[in-house]
Amino acid sequence: MRRGENIYLRKDGRWEGRYIKGKKANGKAKYGSVYGKSFQEVRSKLYPLKAKYQSIRERQGEASMTYQEWGNYWFTEIKSEIKQSTYSNYEYKLKHYVFPEIGEYSLNELNEMVAQRLFQALKEKKLKTTTIRAIFRIINQTMNYAIRKKQIKENPFLLIRFPKVSRIKQQALTKKDQKCLEKQAMREKKGKGIPVLLALHAGLRIGEIAALKWQDIDFENNQISIHSTYQRVLSSDNISRRTSLIYTRSKTESSVRVIPLSQILKKELLEQQKQLRGRYVCSNNDHPAEPRLLTYHFHRIRRKVHLNDVHFHQLRHTFATRCVESNGDIVSISALMGHSSSKMTLDTYADAMMEQRIQVVRQMEKAIS
């Protein structure tokens, strides 16, 4: 039995009132329901909800598919456009951190209050601010895509303000420590020290070293071509945190670069080439040696020379610092490092330029004296 205003008497004796929450992906209306023992009880519950969702639909649009449904749709749209490692990272962060918190909200129900609650929930999980920022950047991509597809009208997640993060500055090795590490790396058998030398003399990332093939090294023209990386990424079953190794093109166009081959590095690489027959410079049965193995060898080497609290990426940082100390220009150093901009290089290695600053001040003093 029906008595107007979308209120019904059900077979079980209860009254039910329905209100429109928005539209489904297929364009059909999505309804919400309230229940009560009488027509008047249901009516009193129904009117505030009708008004609430009328306001939501006018302000934010008709899309009532859940955020989780939209996120999964977005995954299918972007999968062929981005690297597998990037896709796995996006998928893990949304499925592990975001969907459990806000996945059941309809797109048009998402607002600043929901965004703020998510931010607080992530903080309570003791996540670093940098990680939370990364999660929100992914959410913003999904929401901005929803706006482009005319599913919603605005992105409330852009309203969240994050606390400033004090960047931890990486320390380059001293010249003395660098020499000790290099000497030990050269003494290592079976080429186990080669990754250390590639990082210190060419500024390569660990994944770039793992992917490096002999055909990428031009000994005649003294050049190393960098275009690929070998790394661990989350598998498609990424909720269980299983990983797999993939060989793929470098992360950005700026990461694809040509690096001059130093004479020290050339000598060591030629010796290494005589000992190995595989395609890869750092080989494991004619397969690229995985980054974790290279890192393991590095830690064994640095412990032999009593270097504590040093991680592999500091070797790359040391290479750049030595270039700056040698009065290399920022544009060239940025290109060697594979940075996306010279600003990034300046921001990262500004402290290493103190000697240049001192010289500038001295020149200024001479000019006015």
Label each PLM-derived region with a short phrase.
Residues 1-12:
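Short N-terminal "domain-start" leader segments
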Residues 168, 230-232, 337-363:
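Catalytic-site neighborhood detector that most strongly recognizes the C-terminal catalytic loop/helix
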Residues 148, 197, 201-208, 300-304, ...:
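C-terminal catalytic core of tyrosine-transesterase DNA break-rejoin enzymes
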Residues 239, 260-308:
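Active-site/catalytic core of tyrosine-dependent DNA strand-transfer enzymes
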Residues 32, 108, 152-154, 164-183, ...:
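DNA breakage-rejoining catalytic core of tyrosine-based enzymes
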Residues 38, 60-63, 75-156, 167, ...:
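N-terminal core-binding DNA-recognition domain of tyrosine site-specific recombinases/integrases
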Residues 10-16, 21-113, 275, 281:
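N-terminal DNA-binding module of tyrosine recombinases/phage integrases
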Residues 133-135, 148, 152-154, 159-214, ...:
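Basic, Lys/Arg- and aromatic-enriched nucleic-acid-binding interface segment
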